[in-house]
Curated annotation (Swiss-Prot):
UniProt catalytic activity: 2-[(3S)-amino-3-carboxypropyl]-L-histidyl-[translation elongation factor 2] + 3 S-adenosyl-L-methionine = diphthine-[translation elongation factor 2] + 3 S-adenosyl-L-homocysteine + 3 H(+)
Pfam family, one: TP_methylase
The species this protein was found in: Natronomonas pharaonis (strain ATCC 35678 / DSM 2160 / CIP 103997 / JCM 8858 / NBRC 14720 / NCIMB 2260 / Gabara) (Halobacterium pharaonis)
Name used for this protein in its record: Diphthine synthase
Biological role: S-adenosyl-L-methionine-dependent methyltransferase that catalyzes the trimethylation of the amino group of the modified target histidine residue in translation elongation factor 2 (EF-2), to form an intermediate called diphthine. The three successive methylation reactions represent the second step of diphthamide biosynthesis.
Length: 266
């Protein structure tokens, strides 16, 4: 059996009860933290809290050499961990399909996702979100500024009055000069706002440390958000589309948005 367990958003306590039980009953536990991480807990803290040993795999060890994970699942009970949910944004469908091809039973125990938290914290209605996008570091896409695909996604959503959730780049094990096992870099909301404001100085919503006891939420024009600091990672950015009156009021009351920066509600 291979059980995919989402750890949730912040620390060792963010996992569901079902996820915790799966961890403690597993013969072996694997994890990856190159697509996301728990900002409030180290691997050691996870191990100590749940009384388990965790075998952390890098990208190659999951996507190119998954044999040890699959062998463990074939021999007994194996758990594969990620931050958030293992199949949302941080997707590991390929690993699940490889297990299925070997006749290994699989199970998913879901975790809270950044997308769900972004809608909950901001007061923006989740069914008014369009396609999400990821903003990479300029060096990661070999160009300058914001890739056209990111701007196109935001523009297409806005034409339909929809909000855009912008995931911010994470680079673990790879830096500006290529592979680097010591490199760990997380794009901040202020830097993302600065990049986007060069092409689209509209309203943005910055979210930092969703799922923590002290998340930060701020809404303003992107150029104004670029001048602020939002503290430790992980960060997200939302570019709103048309605003319902309740969404408008939520951004003012909950995110401190200046009314002058917001479009009139529809």
């Amino acid at each position: 059996m291979l059980t995919f367990v989402g750890l949730g958003l912040y620390d060792e306590r963010s996992i569901t009860v079902a996820g915790r039980e799966a961890l403690r009953s597993a013969d072996r536990v694997f994890a990856e933290f190159y697509t996301s991480k728990l900002a409030g807990a180290t691997v050691e803290e996870l191990q100590n809290h749940h009384d388990i040993d965790i075998e952390v795999r890098d990208r190659a060890g999951v996507e190119q050499e998954p044999g040890p994970i699959l062998d463990a699942a074939e021999a007994g009970g194996a758990v594969f961990l990620t931050a958030g949910d293992t199949m949302i944004s941080t997707t590991h469908v390929d690993l699940r399909l490889r297990a299925d091809n070997r006749g290994i039973e699989t199970q998913i125990i879901h975790g809270t996702t950044a997308g769900a938290a972004a809608a909950s914290l901001s007061g923006l209605q989740n069914y008014r979100f369009g396609k999400a996008t990821t903003l990479p570091f300029p060096y990661a896409h070999g160009g300058e500024g914001v890739p056209g695909s990111v701007l196109d996604t935001i523009a297409d959503n806005r034409k339909r009055g929809l909000h855009t959730l912008v995931y911010l780049d994470i680079k673990v094990g790879t830096g500006p000069r290529g592979p680097d096992p010591d490199h760990e870099e997380y794009m901040t909301a202020d830097y993302a706002a600065e990049l986007l404001a060069e092409d689209l100085d509209t309203v943005g919503v910055a979210i930092a440390r969703a799922g923590s006891p002290d998340p930060v939420l701020a809404a303003d024009r992107l150029s104004a958000l670029a001048d602020r600091s939002f503290g430790d990672p992980l960060h997200l950015l939302i570019v709103p589309g048309d605003l319902h009156v309740v969404e408008h009021d939520a951004l003012v009351a909950l995110a401190g948005a200046p009314e002058s920066a917001l479009p009139d509600p529809v």
